[in-house]
């Protein structure tokens, strides 16, 4: 599509969708620079350079394939395809773990055909890696409520979840509090399960304590890795032929536009200060964007945050609202808005189906865990993310949990209809 200029307002000639995945424009330049560094100075220099983990992984894919594919999205398609298949596999596993195999298959099928997820998993974004690790964590947490682990398997599950949480910290550290709350909530549900069944599940509890401990230590360990800056003096250049953005110039890591400096948050700041800082950061990062919402709202106290909670939950669950579905977007145009409107309509249906599933399966602790994680995540995002385009991508993980619940709700309706017809 990009090479033949079929949608020039949406895709560059290298396949990057700069209208809906603008980050890819920057990440492809960094990836090319890392390939140059790898070929020129070797693997040690490549490993030492400061760059985000997902960009380094994309650079490895390019290092193998750029001579065949050029620096286009095809060069990272094997890695993105792996992410996509892992996401589908994990959604299936989660549906099977919480409900049954049929629900897992239906949930994975819905996910496989989700239009914007398909589009985003063709780009150079952090989202596919984040979603994969996020689903691993959720699957580990859900398994505490469905399985009886030996202490050895409990340790392995805790380490697997902890490793995934460490990668999430490196890829999207803003989600750390949400993930820690997820692990603590799952631990609380595990305690409830033990009281209900009147037995002590040592292996499960060991795994949960281990995961929570690793998550709590992640910020301290993360500070030892300076992976959040891209210093030009380290010699990362992207002077490669074939990487031609839409403006016809060669993209390089050295000539990329400078990002405006934003204030930093002092270490050890309380949670309300962090929420206020993150919201201000999102507002400052998207000046004049057509999909901004409530940019006039800033938090100056805990009371401000508490008063905004209902609005934040509404934004997290339902935005973009129907009045935005048919308005032309600044970057994505009318087609992008229509697609997001179609998907939001489906999400409304899925949310209703999820509520029906919980009503029919109210005894399933893992199902309630998925719901509460989804609500907590979307509430947190509604609090701090004032740009709907960013919110849209960051909600995918929590949408996938709702899709699992919605798939079970749909199957419950089919079962009820079948039983009625048989009578």
Name what the model sees in each region.
Residues 23-71:
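Short hydrophobic/aromatic helix or loop-helix immediately within or flanking a transmembrane segment
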Residues 74, 91-113:
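Transmembrane-helix signature of polytopic, membrane-embedded enzymes
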Residues 78-98, 349-352:
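Transmembrane-helix motifs of polytopic, lipid-linked glycan transferases
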Residues 97, 147-156, 196-200, 330, ...:
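Membrane-interface helix-loop-helix junctions at transmembrane boundaries of multi-pass membrane enzymes
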Residues 119, 156-179, 209-213:
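Membrane-interface alpha helices of multi-pass inner-membrane proteins
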Residues 122-129:
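Short acidic/glycine- and proline-prone juxtamembrane loop motifs at membrane-interface regions
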Residues 140-149, 156-159, 178-210:
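Perimembrane helix-loop-helix junctions
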Residues 312, 316-326, 337-364:
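Hydrophobic, aromatic-rich transmembrane alpha-helices
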């Amino acid at each position: 599509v990009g090479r033949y200029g079929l949608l020039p307002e949406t895709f560059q000639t290298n396949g990057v969708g700069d209208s809906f995945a603008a980050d890819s424009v920057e990440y492809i330049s960094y990836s090319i620079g890392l390939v140059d560094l790898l070929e020129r100075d070797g693997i040690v220099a490549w490993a030492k350079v400061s760059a985000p983990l997902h960009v380094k992984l994309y650079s490895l894919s390019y290092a193998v394939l750029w001579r065949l594919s050029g620096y286009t999205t095809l060069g990272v398609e094997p890695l993105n395809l792996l992410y996509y298949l892992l996401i589908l596999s994990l959604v299936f596993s989660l549906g099977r773990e919480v409900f049954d195999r049929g629900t897992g298959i239906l949930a994975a099928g819905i996910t496989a055909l989700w239009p914007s997820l398909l589009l985003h998993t063709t780009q150079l974004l952090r989202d596919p890696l984040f979603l994969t690790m996020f689903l691993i964590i959720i699957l580990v947490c859900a398994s505490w409520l469905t399985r009886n682990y030996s202490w050895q398997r409990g340790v392995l599950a805790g380490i697997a979840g902890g490793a995934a949480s460490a990668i999430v910290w490196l890829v999207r550290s803003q989600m750390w509090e949400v993930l820690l709350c997820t692990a603590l909530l799952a631990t609380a549900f595990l305690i409830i399960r033990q009281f209900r069944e009147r037995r002590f599940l040592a292996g499960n509890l060991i795994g949960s304590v281990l995961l929570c401990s690793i998550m709590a230590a992640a910020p301290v360990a993360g500070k030892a890795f300076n992976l959040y800056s891209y210093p030009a003096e380290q010699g990362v250049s992207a002077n490669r032929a074939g990487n031609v953005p839409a403006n016809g110039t060669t993209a390089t890591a050295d000539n990329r536009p400078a990002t405006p400096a934003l204030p930093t948050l002092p270490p050890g700041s309380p949670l309300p200060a962090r929420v206020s800082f993150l919201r201000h950061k999102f507002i400052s990062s998207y000046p004049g964007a057509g999909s901004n919402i409530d940019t006039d709202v800033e938090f100056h106290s805990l009371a401000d945050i508490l008063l905004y909670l209902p609005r934040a939950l509404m934004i997290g669950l339902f935005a973009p609202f129907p009045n935005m579905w048919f308005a032309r977007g600044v970057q994505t145009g009318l087609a992008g808005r229509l697609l997001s409107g179609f998907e939001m309509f489906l999400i409304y249906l899925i949310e209703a189906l999820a509520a029906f599933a919980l009503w029919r399966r109210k005894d399933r602790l893992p199902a309630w865990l998925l719901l509460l994680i989804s609500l907590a995540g979307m509430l947190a995002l509604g609090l701090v993310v004032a740009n709907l385009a960013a919110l849209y991508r960051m909600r995918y993980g929590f949408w996938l949990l709702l899709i699992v619940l919605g798939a079970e709700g749909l199957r419950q309706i089919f079962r009820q209809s079948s039983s009625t017809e048989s009578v």
